[in-house]
Amino acid sequence: MSLMDNLLGILRVRVQRGVNLAVRDVSSSDPYVVLKLGRQKLKTKVVKQNVNPQWQEDLSFTVTDPNLPLTLIVYDHDFFSKDDKMGDAEIDLKPYIEALRMELSGLPDGTIISTIGPSRGNCLAEESYIRWINDRIVQHICLRLRNVERGEVEIELQWIDLPGSKGL
């Protein structure tokens, strides 16, 4: 059995920016983001001395199990010691996957397909909207980091169908 037999598609995660991240060095931090989906792990570049970093980086994961959560961890890069953890968040992909399974062609650009509100059960800092934009389903997410005194990270999800994949 090949990867293509189980492959549903590609999840592209745009790591946009961090907001008011924790200070882990003398007066600032050198943050980067690690994203994990199943056994896959990808990271952004380090932004030096900035608690409001702009990453604007696309990280792409192959998706074989739509039930796996996406985990985000922010670290402070250190040269001479272990990198300090600056908080984490977990993203439930199920609402996004459900939207992908709907028949949505012909909708006006910008249409809100679904709204997910912040709750104790998720890491959302504010309402997250799943929208139809340029014939694609896009979800903008602002995450409140856990296990840290402060900080938020903004990401955007986008799905890429692959020819020959199982699809959703």
Swiss-Prot record:
UniProt keyword annotations, A-Z: Abscisic acid signaling pathway, Calcium, Cell membrane, GTPase activation, Lipid-binding, Membrane, Metal-binding, Nucleus
Single GO cellular component term: plasma membrane
SUPFAM superfamilies: C2 domain (Calcium/lipid-binding domain, CaLB)
Gene Ontology terms describing biological process: abscisic acid-activated signaling pathway; positive regulation of abscisic acid-activated signaling pathway; positive regulation of GTPase activity
Domain C2: 1-106
SMART domains (UniProt xref): C2
Cofactor(s) recorded in Swiss-Prot or TrEMBL: Ca(2+)
Binding site for Ca(2+) 1: R24, D25, D76, D78, D84
Single GO MF annotation: GTPase activator activity
InterPro entries: C2_dom, C2_domain_sf, CAR1-11
Residues the record lists as binding Ca(2+) 2: D25, D30, D76, H77, D78
CDD domains attached to this UniProt entry: C2_ArfGAP
Domain of life: Eukaryota
Subcellular location: Cell membrane; Nucleus
Pfam families listed in its UniProt record: C2 (PF00168)
PANTHER family: PROTEIN C2-DOMAIN ABA-RELATED 3, PROTEIN C2-DOMAIN ABA-RELATED 4
Family: Belongs to the plant CAR protein family.
Functional description taken from the UniProt entry: Stimulates the GTPase/ATPase activities of Obg-like ATPases. Mediates the transient calcium-dependent interaction of PYR/PYL/RCAR abscisic acid (ABA) receptors with the plasma membrane and thus regulates ABA sensitivity.
Subunit note: Binds to PYR/PYL/RCAR abscisic acid intracellular receptors in an ABA-independent manner, both at the plasma membrane and in the nucleus.
Protein name stated in the entry: Protein C2-DOMAIN ABA-RELATED 3
Species of origin: Arabidopsis thaliana (Mouse-ear cress)
